[in-house]
């Protein structure tokens, strides 16, 4: 009886050892998945390197082209309009609402989006439910944008491209901040919309740009990214520069500017410092954000041009 039990136990032990050996071999054969550091939002990875990408954010689309991985994009949103080469890519919806069937039909290895897109009822949870590999990035400041570019470079295997193209981008941003350092900061109102009056708070990418470009955001003490402001608060803050941006039709710009021109006691109105800023340069956390930073610095400190 003891001999039979010993043989059975030895047989089980051999089976376990064999299974462990197979697992080790399989682990050796599985391709390594690029590691993305903590600091971005949720990630669900596909086997590396992903070859069929769907971008649900214009900023990510621009970053992928910056990293010379645009040829891997098989689907984008209707808001993805830069660079021009993206215009012929299949569309899978808007920034907030996407067509799940269209995404599934494209058989992506990975779907990429920004974390803010997952904060509402039309969130990206459905991607997880359908077991679609996805990545959610976050960039609420310029340094976070640079980290996002580095992370996407690792994820797509484009590290060498990032090593060549990212340092000049960072250098331009540093030069702007050095140029405005120590200069008086004009008080700035950035109007996203007028009815109701929506501006940018401390947690927004635009708020970060205003500060780095040498301005003082009059809504800096508000934690919300896009708070609703009121006229009394603006009049009390006495902005020296008023910026207009947002997704409203360009035809509405004269009306929006004329509204503020009636408040002649505002320093910005007295000095004629009311400016339109192309939304994609300051609203979209992609490589062109540095263009937006340079533009804002020139508007805030024209004497330094």
Give the location of each predicted region.
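A ligand-binding cleft/hinge motif common to bilobed small-molecule-binding domains
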Residues: 118-129, 241-259
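Alpha-to-beta junction loops
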Residues: 106-111, 215, 237-242
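A short, structured surface patch at a secondary-structure boundary
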Residues: 51-106, 110-123, 218
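Bacterial N-terminal signal peptides
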Residues: 16-32
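Short helices/loops that flank or line small-molecule/ion binding pockets
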Residues: 100-107, 130, 229-238
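Extracytoplasmic substrate-binding proteins
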Residues: 46-52, 110, 121-198, 219-224, ...
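His/Asp/Glu-enriched short active-site or ligand-binding loop at hydrolase and phosphoryl-transfer sites
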Residues: 77, 203-226, 246, 276
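N-terminal Sec-pathway targeting helices
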Residues: 5-17
């Amino acid at each position: 009886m003891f001999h039979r039990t010993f043989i059975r136990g030895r047989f089980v032990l051999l089976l376990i050892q064999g299974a462990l050996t197979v697992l080790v071999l399989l682990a050796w054969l599985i391709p390594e998945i690029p590691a993305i550091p903590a600091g971005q939002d949720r990630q669900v990875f596909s086997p590396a390197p992903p070859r069929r990408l769907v971008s649900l954010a214009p900023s990510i689309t621009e970053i992928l082209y910056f990293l010379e991985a645009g040829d891997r994009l098989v689907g984008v949103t209707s808001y993805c309009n830069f660079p021009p080469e993206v215009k012929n890519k299949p569309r899978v919806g808007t920034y907030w609402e996407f067509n799940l069937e269209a995404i599934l039909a494209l058989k992506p290895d990975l779907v990429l989006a920004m974390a803010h897109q997952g904060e509402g009822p039309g969130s990206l949870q459905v991607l997880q439910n359908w077991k679609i590999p996805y990545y959610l990035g976050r960039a609420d400041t310029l340094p976070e944008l640079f980290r996002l570019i580095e992370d996407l470079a690792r994820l797509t295997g484009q590290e060498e491209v990032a090593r060549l193209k990212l340092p000049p981008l960072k250098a331009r941003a540093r030069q702007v901040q050095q140029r405005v350092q120590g200069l008086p900061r004009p008080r700035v109102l950035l109007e996203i919309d007028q009815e109701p009056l929506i501006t940018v708070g401390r947690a927004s990418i635009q708020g970060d740009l205003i500060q780095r470009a040498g301005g003082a955001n009059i809504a800096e003490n508000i934690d919300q990214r896009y708070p609703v402001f009121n006229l009394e608060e603006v009049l009390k803050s006495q902005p020296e520069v008023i910026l207009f941006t947002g997704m409203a039709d360009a035809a509405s710009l004269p009306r929006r500017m004329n509204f503020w021109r009636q408040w002649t006691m505002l320093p910005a109105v007295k000095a004629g410092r009311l400016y339109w800023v192309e939304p994609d340069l300051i609203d979209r956390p992609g490589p062109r954000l540095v263009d937006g930073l340079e533009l804002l610095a020139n508007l805030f400190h024209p004497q330094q041009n």
